[in-house]
Amino acid sequence: MDALLQLKGIDKAFPGVKALSGAALNVYPGRVMALVGENGAGKSTMMKVLTGIYTRDAGSLLWLGKETTFNGPKSSQEAGIGIIHQELNLIPQLTIAENIFLGREFVNRFGKIDWKKMYAEADHLLAKLNLRFKSDKLVGELSIGDQQMVEIAKVLSFESKVIIMDEPTDALTDTETDSLFRVIRELKSQGRGIVYISHRMKEIFEICDDVTVFRDGQFIAEREVATLTEDSLIEMMVGRKLEDQYPHLDNAPGEIRLKVDNLCGPGVNDVSFVLRKGEILGISGLMGTGRTELMKVLYGAMPRTSGYVTLEGHEVVTRSPQDGLANGIVYISEDRKRDGLVLGMSVKENMSLTALDYFSRAGGSLKHKDEQQAVGDFIRLFNVKTPSMEQAIGLLSGGNQQKVAIARGLMTRPKVLILDEPTRGVDVGAKKEIYQLINQFKADGLSIILVSSEMPEVLGMSDRIIVMHEGHLSGEFTREQATQEVLMAAAVGKLNRVNQE
């Protein structure tokens, strides 16, 4: 089968770094090509070379059988290559239709915008994606998941022959993911080629036909997905066997440290649970069931309307995140780029931001040596891959950004560490490093709450698991009781089993 798009022998170097060396990628009509590799493997650089953001140092790009060079995203888009970025690229103050057709508005014979036609076309695109809202809605009123679907509708509006999807389901619910997969299958039947960049093995084996593996900027292999297992694919990605993906630590938890009684707040109804010293408590449930809201009410980022929280026997009232930090409760957000990190600031500044009290003199000036020492220690402990602590954090891979976000929380010396989706957007190698760090915190006696949409992660790492359904607690299970089936039954409200201590 002839490829729609073929990149061969692609080299790209930056000062001191060879980002791509002999990289290759083929995209075939009517097939989905997964592009996989650890963070820093060269996937993003390859996409930037393809779309003309970067100029390749060597190699060839064949588009529809002809040697081609794109001089920027506009030229590749007009040629028929659409890309859906992981970072949303929408204007919240405009409607869905205005975002989809921005700069390409329909005009009538009098030169005025044909609003009726534009909204009708946009509604048609949304209907193709099985979405329940109309295109006259403001983008800013949509959830992150729905905004992602608008991005997909926008690319579909270009009638692209090849569509690149970069972690497209990262913020989508299961229903939205099913809708996306239905659309991908429709696009395949129309003869379009899809590049599907993802860390999610389950999705790759469900929706992709072929897979291309990158490692350290090099092309490793192209295979049919049907010929692989998850383990063999991961081994190609990391270049080593991944023994025991979830390294659980069997240390018995200690006495009760945190007690939550009848907690209520936005999206949270009458939730009670306990957390012990040296325990990992998993929080499971479907998206939108109140898991993140519960954590934010506990931490002080959302208002508590009723209920009691005691920490080491003393009542805690958290009206703000500052109250949470002051009481020894740290929350690491699921959206590290919006709530967690300041991307334009350095690794050092991000890591020490919430712990400046520890590095300040009585007059308010900073003890820079102490700050540098502490940041350096955490960089070594967490194996953060960065040229220096002065590097802008936005230039680090997702896994290294997440390590910095967790390190920042630990700098305040907390008693309770809340990790909300700690491995989202993180490659398989960095995931294991984060799991090992979590076990280290547990061994040191830290109390950890692990919120995750990945059931194997919750099952593999937790000592005990509670499940949320529609703002309520619908189940509480020991590690031995918990299975994927039991957690899913509780998550959809078919099972209600809560053990109160």
Curated annotation (Swiss-Prot):
It is found in: Cell inner membrane. InterPro entries: AAA+_ATPase, ABC_carbohydrate_import_ATPase, ABC_transporter-like_ATP-bd, ABC_transporter-like_CS, P-loop_NTPase. Residues 5-241, 252-495 form the ABC transporter domain. It is a peripheral membrane protein. Its main location: membrane. It catalyses: D-ribose(out) + ATP + H2O = D-ribose(in) + ADP + phosphate + H(+). ATP binds at G37, E38, N39, G40, A41, G42, K43, S44. SMART domains: AAA (SM00382). Keywords: ATP-binding, Cell inner membrane, Cell membrane, Membrane, Nucleotide-binding, Repeat, Sugar transport, Translocase, Transport. Its EC number is 7.5.2.7. The keyword Cell membrane applies. GO terms for molecular function: ABC-type D-ribose transporter activity; ATP binding; ATP hydrolysis activity. It holds the Pfam family ABC_tran. It comes from the Bacteria. GO terms for cellular component: plasma membrane. It is an enzyme of class 7 (translocase). The keyword Membrane applies. The complex is composed of an ATP-binding protein (RbsA), two transmembrane proteins (RbsC) and a solute-binding protein (RbsB). Belongs to the ABC transporter superfamily. Ribose importer (TC 3.A.1.2.1) family. Part of the ABC transporter complex RbsABC involved in ribose import. Responsible for energy coupling to the transport system. NCBIfam families: PRK10762.1 (NF008030). This is Ribose import ATP-binding protein RbsA. It comes from Salmonella typhi. The lineage of its organism: Bacteria, Pseudomonadati, Pseudomonadota, Gammaproteobacteria, Enterobacterales. The gene is rbsA.
